[in-house]
Amino acid sequence: MTYEDNPYVEKNEFIGMKPIEDRIPTYEEMCDKLPKPIFDGHDDYIACYDYAWRTAFGNITSPFVNDKFVSDFVKTAFNGCLFMWDSSFILMYGKYAKRLFSFQQTLNNLYALQHKDGYICREITEEEGLDRFCRHDPSSTGPNLMAWCEWNYFESFGDIERLKKVYAPLRAFHVWFRKNRTWRDGSYFSSGWGCGMDNIPRLQPEYDERFSHGYMVWIDTCAQQMMNCDFLIKMNEVLQCDDVSDLVEEREYLNKLINETLWDEKTAFYYDLWRNNELNMVKHIGSFWTLLAKAVPEERLERYVAHLRDPKEFNRVNAVPTLSADHPLYNPHGQYWRGSSWAPTSFMVLAGLSANGCHDIAYEIGDKFLKNVVTVYNDTGTLWENYAPDFAERGNQSRPNFVGWTGIVPISIFFEYVLGIQPKVSEKRIVWRVNRTERHGIMQYPFGTEHTLDLVCEARSSVSEEPQITVSSNKPIEILVVWDGKEKLIKA
């Protein structure tokens, strides 16, 4: 193989790293030490939460007999391969068990198998540690979300030592992605498999929706790369280790491209751009990566977010469908990415809404999705790969026991959007958006490197009533409590 050397790869400490050998804990050993949600009157939510952790711990494994993986990891639970984007979302909830098992070290195995030009394959066999794709295949890598995952972890625990280690491979991968996944104008491309959304009908009909780039500008990939610039810049603000002027320039360029080229003013939506310079006019969930990238100008935000409120589009029985319901190929039972509600993309929408201050609708969507997932859990006893958008049932093309990334719903969405508790280590506080009126909270909540908190809100007669909050912490902490347009600061 021919490679162009990438100077950041030379700083990648995971390549050739001595394997970490730890005893893998069992759920039975650790269940009493996990965070314990309180949600009076909703025992089924707690049962679903417990099931998610039990299944997740059952998917932790040591490296198989090979010299390539360097850390214990949580399996993707799909096809015997470790997936880049599945892992990034699995760790969004795995972080809450940090002090019991480091789910985050799953990504170590991807960093350890980085090629010397910066490439990382999106899918690597768990037993042999082999790439499933050649690097110039449009489906070989992506989505590029690992920097978001690492920053999310840092925001919860402030682990600067890990940030120092992961910066180089993340930066190297961004450089590779920019050199190998852009058109001549600096816009980005992928494929159905490369973007992780296999069969969304977004390409011109002569191209294969799974494997072809279709000579198209991909809205999700452009927004993800803009977002990735931002997270790498934030990391460098902490680490002060790099010249990131190229990232600043690229972020500004992608922001301009997204808003001048991929926006349709009439429909107030961001679209993919076909090779004939026509917007494809397919409203799909990939567009909403623009929220997390902070690409949506304030004057466009209300009209854009309105699509998530429209029952003819994305506001269905379940949230959030991957294809707008007014598309002729929308399937009310799912058909994989032609309508199904998926845990990772719905979580992305919630995070993007929250990043833009749209907290009320983030709560509404999160509450709806969690309610449906718990309802289906009650009916089937398991968590599914995806869910039907128009019915409280599994998607018609979905796998059971998918924990896997579906664990993000009864854990992270439950904690962060329904219970409303979000960690902000960089601000040295927790923000608690109190939307519920029943007694609720979390016991044994991990925050930062040393904090363990018990957080309890007593029952209220209405959403306007001031929450009565009890906080117990082993270290001093600030809790910003927000409710009904008001807020108060608690120091414990």
Feature names for model-found ranges:
Residues E10-K11, G80-W193, I219-C222, M226, ...:
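Aromatic-rich carbohydrate-recognition surfaces in CAZymes
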Residues Y3-V9, F39-L82, Q105-D137, T182-V217, ...:
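Extended glycan-interaction surfaces of carbohydrate-active proteins
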Residues I219-T261:
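Active-site neighborhood of glycoside hydrolase catalytic domains
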Residues K36-I46, G94-L107, Y153-R171, K234-E252, ...:
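Structural helix-adjacent loops and short alpha-helical linkers that scaffold large soluble proteins
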Residues H307-F314, Q335, A351-A492:
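Non-catalytic C-terminal accessory modules of carbohydrate-active enzymes
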Residues M1-G80, I160-K165, R171-R178, K234-D243, ...:
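Acidic/polar, glycine-enriched structural segments that form the non-catalytic walls/loops
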Residues W176, F231-K234, R303, I413:
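Alpha-helical scaffold segments in soluble metabolic enzymes
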